[in-house]
Swiss-Prot record:
Protein name as it appears in the record: Adenine deaminase
Residues that coordinate or bind Zn(2+): H14, H16, H194, D275
Similarity section: Belongs to the metallo-dependent hydrolases superfamily. Adenosine and AMP deaminases family. Adenine deaminase type 2 subfamily.
Function: Catalyzes the hydrolytic deamination of adenine to hypoxanthine. Plays an important role in the purine salvage pathway and in nitrogen catabolism.
Organism: Pseudomonas putida (strain ATCC 47054 / DSM 6125 / CFBP 8728 / NCIMB 11950 / KT2440)
Length: 315
């Protein structure tokens, strides 16, 4: 079944480039940039990938991202991910990147963007993988900081297809960012946002009504609100669900408890994605395979999930 799932044409719509930084590349970049790491070796770092919640993961994620310093680093990060896409027949990807993770530590916005954009261009030309880049604001920072990031992005408007919202969800509702999303949409950006991962269904309502998003990233807690579920079904609002991430971060205690197939059978346009694959134990095919192994996902369901991902593309 794994090989069949791997060969299925699919799109990935929820992937953080910084979260695809495999330990081997992390150590290589640290050596290239002469950065001392707190882990003795690759296996010690892998051993640290045991998280009880989103925040524990984010603490390690930001620490790991510190090795990314130059255009070449960001190119190598993105290119390594695109090679994974090619190997798993991901024919289209819409990755996120978090400029604030880098600008806050003194890396120029253009350095980050140039490296990523060149790799995506090469991915189109050499690997045949189409793509669109999503600029994501960090919700644990202020809206003023997000506004500054949007200012930095506007001279490169054509490099992005959308703006998003990620990082620590609890205590940082979508309403906190209404003004910057209003402004981004007025500049022609499509909006997406993480909502309903650890946060309550109310956060999904806010993301839809205040941020006017076209796609919900995660959204698994929507199932707790019947009226919200009906709206998502009626309006066919896509959900970019990340099963391995959800179990690794204890949103669900075990994959057998995941609700993605329940949502699929109710008519929700759910998709399968890897989120931060270097940290969560798998890329897109591994996520599909986990659904087959633990939830008995059928070939028909897998085809529908893959088709949903292709239908839910922004570009």
């Amino acid at each position: 079944m794994y090989d069949w799932l791997n060969a299925l044409p699919k799109a990935e719509l929820h992937l953080h480039l910084e979260g695809s930084l495999e330990p081997e590349l992390l150590f290589a970049l640290a050596e290239r940039n002469k950065i001392a790491l707190p882990w003795a070796d690759v296996e010690t770092l892998r051993g640290a990938y045991a998280f009880n919640n989103l925040q524990e993961f984010l603490d390690l994620y930001y620490q790991g991202a510190d090795v990314l310093r130059t255009e070449q680093d960001f190119y190598d990060l993105t290119w390594a991910y695109l090679q994974r896409c090619k190997a798993q027949n991901v024919i289209h990807t819409e990755p996120f990147f978090d400029p604030q993770t880098h600008t806050d530590r003194g890396i120029a916005f253009e350095v980050v963007l140039n490296g990523i954009s060149q790799a995506l261009k090469d991915g189109r030309e050499q690997l045949g993988i189409s793509s669109g880049l999503i600029l994501s604001f960090l919700r644990h920072l202020s809206e003023d900081e997000a506004q500054k990031t949007l200012d930095q992005a506007l001279p490169f408007r054509d490099a992005f297809i959308a703006v998003g919202l990620d990082s620590s969800e609890m205590g940082h509702p979508p309403s906190k960012f209404q003004r910057v999303f209003d402004r981004a949409r007025s500049e022609g950006f499509v909006a997406v946002a993480h909502a309903g991962e650890e946060g309550p269904p109310e956060y999904i309502w806010e993301a839809l009504d205040l941020l006017k998003i076209k796609r919900i990233d995660h959204g698994v807690r929507a199932i707790e609100d019947e009226r919200l579920m009906q709206r998502i079904i009626d309006e066919q609002i896509p959900l970019t669900v990340c099963p391995l991430s959800n179990t690794k971060l204890c949103v669900f205690d075990h994959m057998s408890q995941h609700n993605i197939l329940d949502m699929l059978e109710r008519g929700v346009k759910v998709t399968v994605n890897s989120d931060d694959p270097a940290y969560f134990g798998g890329y897109v095919t591994e996520n599909f395979h986990a659904l087959h192994t633990h939830l008995g996902m059928t070939e028909d369901q897998a085809r529908r999930l893959a088709q949903n991902s292709l239908d839910a593309r922004l570009v």
